[in-house]
């Protein structure tokens, strides 16, 4: 009888501890926001030499989510499937140099833009390409499912391009540019500016840009409550100067839109 009583007490204790652990885990998840990122999109979000995820958007997201009283968890995703990841609930936010477009507005909710950008054309420093018109008959590269594709397709030069190769990341596109497999790369200005600081003798950018654009945070279409919470926290981080400090850290100047 004593042995049976001991066994019952043990089982009850194990069940209780398991329930406590589950409740603790559930509360922890409730306090987290999963942010979908492209972890090869420097300087917005990328892996450093220690394989840590860093970048302008990473620091900004941390500050905003902390202002909300929550924890930011960064989830690298296939950028071509970002909206699917959001709609499925596997991530809560898309936040990594995410350009506002009319097409995307049909799929997601956007915060107010916080940063301006342009789609530009990167070439090798010794290239004979001098203007957009010189791209006629040339091979171009760009990141798949990115706003670079929209910018190129909407340009006057689009019909004269020889061919376009889509890459999983901008890094791969720039590698093919260096190896001579493409003649130019359509890319975010903030991204190529970063790589030109690393390789100043390798790349240059045409003076003419393809399209201006704005970065914002993407939220699931029906989640207006989360959108409002993120926007309120973003406004505070901008107002108190934290966003400007983060911009100075990564860009050397305050690029934040007020």
What are these regions (language model features)?
Residues 16-19:
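C-terminal motif of bacterial Sec signal peptides marking the signal peptidase cleavage site
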Residues 22-25, 147-165, 204-207, 234-258:
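Ligand-binding clefts/hinges and TM-proximal coupling segments of bilobed small-molecule sensing domains
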Residues 26-97:
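Extracytoplasmic small-molecule ligand-binding "clamshell" domains
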Residues 39, 116-123, 189, 193-234, ...:
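Periplasmic-binding protein-like
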Residues 45-49, 61-69, 148-167, 196-200:
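Ligand-binding cleft/hinge of the Venus flytrap
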Residues 58-67, 126, 133-134, 139, ...:
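Extended ligand-binding regions for polar small-molecule ligands
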Residues 62, 71-134, 204, 209:
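Acidic, polar ligand-binding/catalytic clefts
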Residues 98-106, 151-154, 176-179, 183-212:
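A ligand-binding cleft/hinge motif common to bilobed small-molecule-binding domains
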